[in-house]
């Protein structure tokens, strides 16, 4: 056991952790050359394309160190994006050490800081590594100083390497052996193994990635999951070298995969503890949480007969992604569809893209919303995540909205812009800290403002230099109202929004004028109105297309022309009573882009 090293890699998107992982696998001979593809651990197409890691993957590598001993290095790959922070904390809790990979030309970013603090809180040994030192813009001294200023760990003499060209990779492996402690644990104690990740395989059902903390797990053992109380039998055990290799048993300190008869991902929750039925552990390992959805959106098929296909597709995605929640919902404007819950905006985009790409679905997505707590006058408390489900204004005592704490790292020259942006979004400044050339701002922001377009705005106002990390803080009472959009006097439920009273009129006007541009002209006038309750706050008209009925009259009597115009007017009036207006998909998307300029 003293020769096992469990570690993960913490890095910001694009700082090169997947490439570094590839180099480790190549160096330790985990795969032969024909099986090496770039970014071996990122197995989803969308992961490779966006260059991000979504699910945790592992590789068990045998490394012969310079001292002549063979060490088993278990690399647990972690996602770097803020939406997947729970997965990161689970991956880290399975390790004793973490490599902090920082791009030597770019320096430290906010997500790196957040994940690094998570690691330090979990008591994980953090080893700094500077990557991309072969770039002409690399400045190792400055970045070492930044790591010390911002994160507060000793970075003098941090290992320098370039994962792309392979320089210094061996030094990094030596550093892992030297700095990261061997796992602690007792092979003879009752079994406690934490589920680091789980995914669905078409042939064997659910595959769980586990880290054995105490005890030993063998083939054909009967096991129990401690949070769901489900019981099952071990069918297969083994390790990934990224290929799967079967084993008879896994002992304390090891990381490997476990396949049982479980068919549903909901039974094997990430962070849960597995123990033996015959000799159970007295308590589960700490740190397990149920994942809460933060952002909600409606997904509707463009063709209503695709509804069942969409349900199947969502169920299949849920097999691999336990944090995706969905329930059926009906909208008058869009027909049958689903209300889905996501971890954040990136998660929403990824799910939408996977549905379109892997399942060939044509989707309409409504504006993302967050959960509000509504206290009614009779003292009852309800949760509302769909604006059209908000009860009547008369029956509401208060509405509470979710507040997040955002940590923003930004170069000094853009601080003013970022602060202005946060104030526009009703943010409250909590802290401001100068660290070298960077400034760390902490703000409490309403989540509602963040899901709209905060991230894009933050990037554009800081020329892409600012980086953001956030976590949920609490619900706070706020002066919120529901804004309805009416087309031809009928409410379009899918376009309702919950907004702050101050910005309601402004938003209403912007939306109405945007809708006017996007709704195709019909044969009759269409009124687009924004309303709060029964009060109309903005109106725009989509002008009718009309035929020039006077084209055939040359000269002649005015009454003849009047007669033709009256006839046309009557026809338009009749049309308006029966005509219904198709609202194009672009109009729904426009709602997202209407910003508080």
From Swiss-Prot:
GO CC annotations on file: plasma membrane
HAMAP family to which the protein is assigned, alphabetical: LepA
Gene Ontology molecular-function annotations: GTP binding; GTPase activity; guanosine tetraphosphate binding; ribosome binding; translation elongation factor activity
Amino-acid positions noted as binding GTP in the UniProt annotation, renumbered to this chain: 14-19, 131-134
SMART domains xref list: EFG_C
Protein known as: Elongation factor 4
Gene Ontology annotations of biological process type: positive regulation of translation
Known role: Required for accurate and efficient protein synthesis under certain stress conditions. May act as a fidelity factor of the translation reaction, by catalyzing a one-codon backward translocation of tRNAs on improperly translocated ribosomes. Back-translocation proceeds from a post-translocation (POST) complex to a pre-translocation (PRE) complex, thus giving elongation factor G a second chance to translocate the tRNAs correctly. Binds to ribosomes in a GTP-dependent manner.
Family: Belongs to the TRAFAC class translation factor GTPase superfamily. Classic translation factor GTPase family. LepA subfamily.
Organism: Neisseria meningitidis serogroup A / serotype 4A (strain DSM 15465 / Z2491)
This protein's UniProt keywords: Cell inner membrane, Cell membrane, GTP-binding, Hydrolase, Membrane, Nucleotide-binding, Protein biosynthesis
EC number: 3.6.5.n1
PANTHER family the UniProt entry points to: TRANSLATION FACTOR GUF1 HOMOLOG, CHLOROPLASTIC, TRANSLATION FACTOR GUF1-RELATED
CDD domains in the record: EF4_II, EF4_III, LepA, lepA_C
Entry keyword Isomerase: no
Top-level taxon of the source organism: Bacteria
Subcellular location: Cell inner membrane
Domain called tr-type G: residue spans: 2-184
Enzyme's top EC category: hydrolase
Record membrane topology: Peripheral membrane protein
